[in-house]
Amino acid sequence: GVEALVRWQHPKHGLLAPDRFIPLAEQTGMIKPLTYYVLRSALRHCEGWRRAGLDLSMSVNISAINIQDPEFPGQVAEILKEFSVPPACLELEITETAVMSEPVRAVECIKKLSALGVLIAIDDFGTGYSSMSYLKELLVAKIKIDKSFVTDMANNRNDAVIVRSTVELGHNLGLKVVAEGVETQVVWDKLSALGCDDAQGYYMSHPLSADGLTEWLQQSPWGKKTSSS
């Protein structure tokens, strides 16, 4: 699968990363239309790739503001109707911190999204102050181990222990586990030995445009694994 990344081509400051403008979008209320724009754009590309025979899923990060919005699940349902992409091929990622900011609302929203068939992932797992009493109620399919634990796990024993424990916890809960921030073959091999389900990071690829991704999928050994049989 792939994850949607949004950048802002600012007329004065050039290409801005999300951490430069997402907080502003949240403060001004622009995060809602921005999220819907990203969802439509991501699903449009996913639809095209799937029609070309590439069995891809699409992940989109959502804000705490989205997860607290009672209208959000309905909006997602309407957007899904616009594209020939199975709901299970859309994965919405939310951080632990976002869930715990309004846990009751978050649980209710996630239940409605799950009822649509959309998959939910907890992003940056291990960096927030989550309550297991709420996490066990969330109908999540996946947890993503934050890159701060993964990138140096080959050299840092504590990081390695945290990653191993998180993989075991996720699997014991029946969840898939993804490691973020994989930059070397050594780390990839260690994750594989732990039975980690998936990984993402510069070892696989740097961020790509939609056109660049299409070419990468056709040429890279990683991309060829997504081709439909």
Each language-model region and where it sits:
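Catalytic core regions of nucleotide second-messenger enzymes
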Residues: 14, 50-56, 84
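Conserved functional hotspot residues or short segments at active or partner-binding sites
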Residues: 109
